[in-house]
Amino acid sequence: MAMDRIEVKGARAHNLKNIDVTIPRDQLVVVTGLSGSGKSSLAFDTIYAEGQRRYVESLSAYARQFLGQMDKPDVDAIEGLSPAISIDQKTTSRNPRSTVGTVTEIYDYLRLLYARVGKPHCPEHGIEITSQTIEQMVDRILEYPERTKLQVLAPIVSGRKGAHVKVLEQIRKQGYVRVRIDGEMAELSDDIELEKNKKHSIEVVIDRIVVKEGVAARLSDSLETALRLGEGRVMIDVIGEEELMFSEHHACPHCGFSIGELEPRLFSFNSPFGACPTCDGLGMKLEVDADLVIPNQDLSLKENAVAPWTPISSQYYPQLLEAVCTHYGIDMDVPVKDLPKHQLDKVLYGSGDDLIYFRYENDFGQIREGEIQFEGVLRNIERRYKETGSDFIREQMEQYMSQKSCPTCKGYRLKKEALAVLIDGRHIGKITELSVADALAFFKDLTLSEKDMQIANLILREIVERLSFLDKVGLDYLTLSRAAGTLSGGEAQRIRLATQIGSRLSGVLYILDEPSIGLHQRDNDRLISALKNMRDLGNTLIVVEHDEDTMMAADYLIDIGPGAGIHGGQVISAGTPEEVMEDPNSLTGSYLSGKKFIPLPPERRKPDGRYIEIKGASENNLKKVNAKFPLGTFTAVTGVSGSGKSTLVNEILHKALAQKLHKAKAKPGSHKEIKGLDHLDKVIDIDQAPIGRTPRSNPATYTGVFDDIRDVFAQTNEAKVRGYKKGRFSFNVKGGRCEACRGDGIIKIEMHFLPDVYVPCEVCHGKRYNRETLEVTYKGKSISDVLDMTVEDALSFFENIPKIKRKLQTLYDVGLGYITLGQPATTLSGGEAQRVKLASELHKRSTGRTLYILDEPTTGLHVDDIARLLVVLQRLVDNGDTVLVIEHNLDIIKTADYIVDLGPEGGAGGGTIVASGTPEEITEVEESYTGRYLKPVIERDKTRMKSLLKAKETATS
């Protein structure tokens, strides 16, 4: 019999405590719990890993080697599994050739559509290019009324310079009498002299015909002769009216522009047949950017305003610049912005043909001198970039280059032949520029001829179906040409979700990791109905999620806890959402039922008159936005997905501040100016990127507390006696580390066809250090024992050392008391990595002049984690600093001092500021979707707080 549930027995992956779980099949199951409690360990590292592994085991050993190794999870048994598909956030392609269209395969169908029913047009003349038979030409000409006079002409020269004596001589020999030269009739018996430096067009008059009955045979003979002479082209001059051009080849009759047979690869920018030859199908070209070459125009040339020519070791370029300035009389002590344009142009673009005297003396006193042509700083960088064989130089030069739209294909990525094929007046590049919603409307209303409709019917059905799936999961604002690398984790995941809905599989186990990330409350219902739709096809969905709406919509809810890390790993409660809400042990249940909640702040901070202000922001979809962010407050930037939040904050504000305050090289998005810089001295972006890419990086090394701990060990009597310095206690350098495993503690053994096996090092038994180093102890513990301690244990262990205690306290405050100091960075979740970064900021001394930017800090956080995160963020603001978050989570938004709401819609329908002010002010704005969803939350929490106060008063009385 088919099992109606998945039984997991004895799961021990990571921090799971040998748990048994029962999951109903063909249901929407949500797994929730604190960050680090073991949700992903259960869903991904146990259930998915085993489902995938069993499926892959059925393939041949040859096929398995290409699929990557699947570890067997640490579990006793799992029954009732189906093949598993995981839709997570990690696997987005960063390849610049990947676009929303290619990832969803919509672009493949578009290519097919254009190859089958597209109409080629001449890019010069706009004429549709068709090939016609003589019968079709005759029929077209005989449409004219009777007695119409016309001439049949054979074009033999079109728009070419020369006297064309030989051509005319040849025609005369063939027995022709008349020609038309540049529109004027001439007899070949006359002396014809043409100016050889002018362009000429020559047509031979083959026949003169009057349209009447019985003329068809003569007309087709004349056309045949004309086509032979005109190499496949013929011109019909209807006297006193118009001229017709016919071609028997697939070519423009005027200029001969032709396209071979249309095939799908012609429209692929990843194939040499279709890609634009200038940018190789990327749509962008790296070009030297004058703004990056001279980032600060307030400096003079003497103060090294030309960034790439700042002297490092050699004085060659500074001396060359001096020679150029001497030659042209350019003042090197004046700020660059005050130099006349023609002088600055000489420095940037070179001296042309002028020769400049240049005398160069190197560090060894050797002298070279002579007259040289100066190529200009920009050309110099471009040349060095193209000619160098060294990756280092190429990277150096790339810092001064930026991506510009390709001049040949205007950013459409395809060669001109592909862009000359139109459907309904648009080429394929124009279609990919449309948002999903607009493209859907375009294809639904598309009218084609009956024959074309028959051919395109199936293709159109696929395109419309896929577009509507994207629309269903709330991605209607994305354009098909959007690069996949610029999508947020949630967007990428919802795209894959749409692709899966499109495949309409049944009986599959889908495992999703927080699909609601980056999704506004408004679009949440669409996502939930998409998930239910997949469930109704007969699939089991296991969703790791913290979103309240998704949890309430689940058929079955599993709460893992009670704490995080070593304090978690158990099933606290499982059942319908209502059953979990009733369970007194479940933290999630308490939040869902309202017994626990994040309170509103007693009062909101008032802006103190210090602002950072962006004027005229117009990158991506922003419509010349002017935004003000009050400093010294906790500010949230909100708006539906795709409204322009990340563009405004990350692309413009962060990059512009980093460029001005930290001399960063990244170029900010387009805007007029930014005011209020004098109130800040640093900007810090705290994102969820891993804190290190290797297992050697860990929370202790990242926060800098490991340095202090090594100092403590180096100060012990034993270390002093042995002469050990702090370097002895590092596992990254020779000396104190175990050399057998080079301080890793584990040794990797590569196995083909089987997962790589990691075994503890036999010499140090996983302790990373050699025996001598481990003999040095502090309070009875070796350096290796300290790395194995949790933050919580280390806090009490080092409580007498204020320097260490302060750093560990901040890790504990952000809710990371459960991680060990030596936990490899690669095993931390995104939320944990972000909190490690927050902690390392918290223990620094505050100046009150720092701006912290956090993009969706609630990703991966449970409501209880969010409560802790808020305490930390409010602490930063209490220190006088400014915190700016991009957020959809209403618990964060309701506690902000100030909100800037973008919208009203996503994509082209967004990019303006809908409202700004306190949360209460936002709820009063009709057009604001954020306000609409925030209002009931604020009212609900006010009621909750009142009843809490009442309960307290009753208790005290």
Curated annotation (Swiss-Prot):
This is UvrABC system protein A. SUPFAM superfamilies: P-loop containing nucleoside triphosphate hydrolases (SSF52540). The gene is uvrA. Disulfide bonds: none annotated. The keyword Amino-acid biosynthesis does not apply. A zinc finger (C4-type) spans 252-279, 738-764. InterPro entries: AAA+_ATPase, ABC_transporter-like_ATP-bd, ABC_transporter-like_CS, ATP_grasp_subdomain_1, P-loop_NTPase, UvrA, UvrA_DNA-bd, UvrA_inter. HAMAP family: UvrA. It holds the Pfam family UvrA_DNA-bind. NCBIfam families: PRK00349.1, uvra. One of its GO terms (molecular function) is DNA binding. Forms a heterotetramer with UvrB during the search for lesions. PROSITE patterns: ABC_TRANSPORTER_1, ABC_TRANSPORTER_2.
